[in-house]
Regions:
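Active-site rim elements
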Residues: 95-101, 160-164, 238-245, 264-272
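Short glycine/proline- and charge-enriched loop/turn segments
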Residues: 10, 86-94, 231-238
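NAD(P)-dinucleotide binding in Rossmann-like oxidoreductases
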Residues: 126-127, 132-139, 146-251
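Beta-strand-loop-alpha-helix segment that lines the small-molecule cofactor/substrate pocket
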Residues: 1-48, 63
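C-terminal helix-rich "cap/oligomerization" subdomain common to oxidoreductases
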Residues: 34, 180, 210, 215, ...
């Protein structure tokens, strides 16, 4: 509704991911984008602005990896962050669209960027097994739950219960994805990981890269020689006032400012259609988890393509 009002008012909108919470809203947004143009909605898929993403795009332009064959990736968050999800309005799928949509659409978009095409089949398993009553630390002799209440939560629909939460979201999930070109992704997320990480390894016909957004490193090797062709650690920037999303928030703000106000000739690295695609993938991943079936996205992409959003 907010996006619609902004478009009707003729303004350019910046919308935080995932911009929609379900498929019905996705098709409603598609109608709006078809009418007003996809360039009128900018999106906060911030990982594409990160130094990791910039370096990977440069390496891919140099054909350092060849054809991408497979990716292994994860996004894990600390217990206090998991406690936040169990208490915040995001704990309700009707509001947030579910954990993998709300939190991990960043990652799904990032890996689609690397592969260079859409997912075509997904399968998923997961559940809520950590933030449940019988796993409360109080029952295990702990004196308090302060670590899970670290994030102050005054605000809409917030509650204080963590292990007795009325949440209907998962606290852990795995997904496997097959892309249109045959590449595959294995993805894992968990919201109770004290030494959190957001790690990935991408493997291609000519080389590989591995990195961790949290720890800051990114390394790449050539398959034929075994030699290291890239080795950087961006973590130092996190300690110098650029911590938001591993320094990517500031990079995104600069790029968007240049795009809107400084006549930048460089297109933004991500758009609203990318965000819609990542959202649909997340929704189908949850559909697989809920139905215990492999989900084919062929019809989903046909429906989206009928709006001709890539060619407006």
């Amino acid at each position: 509704e907010h996006i619609q009002k902004g478009l009707e008012a003729g303004v350019t909108i910046f919308a935080e991911k995932p911009i929609v919470a379900n498929e019905e809203q996705t098709w409603q947004l598609a109608e709006l984008i078809k009418k007003y143009g996809k360039d009128k909605v900018l999106v906060g898929l911030v990982l594409r602005y990160s130094k990791h993403a910039r370096s990977i795009r440069k390496l891919m332009k140099e054909d350092a990896f060849g054809k991408i064959i497979s990716i292994e990736a994860s996004e894990h968050i600390m217990p206090w962050h998991g406690g936040f999800f169990m208490r915040n309005w995001r704990r309700k799928t009707s509001y947030s669209g579910g954990f993998i949509l709300e939190k991990c659409c960043h990652d799904l978009d990032f890996y689609s960027m690397i592969v260079g095409c859409r997912p075509i089949r997904v399968a998923s398993f997961g559940g809520r097994n950590a933030f449940v009553p019988d796993q409360s630390p109080i029952l295990q002799g702990e004196k308090n739950l302060d670590v899970y209440l670290e994030y102050n939560l005054p605000g809409w629909e917030s509650k204080e219960e963590v292990f007795d939460s009325d949440a209907d979201i998962v606290d852990h999930q795995v997904a496997i994805i097959e892309y249109e070109n045959g590449a595959t992704l294995a993805f894992h997320t968990n919201m109770k990981v004290p030494d959190e990480f957001r790690r990935f390894a991408l493997i291609g016909t000519k080389g590989m890269a591995e990195g961790d957004f949290v720890r800051g490193y990114l390394k790449a090797h050539n398959s034929h020689t075994g030699k290291k062709i890239f080795d950087e650690n961006f973590g130092a920037a996190f300690q110098q006032g650029t911590k938001g999303h591993y320094g990517a928030d500031q990079l995104m703000l600069k790029d968007i400012n240049d795009y809107l106000f400084n006549n930048s000739s460089h297109p933004l690295p991500v758009g609203v259609v990318n965000c819609m695609e990542a959202g649909l993938v997340a929704m189908k991943i949850d559909e697989s988890r809920e139905t215990n079936q492999i989900i084919d996205l062929t019809d989903t992409w046909k429906k989206l393509d009928n709006y001709n959003l890539q060619n407006d």
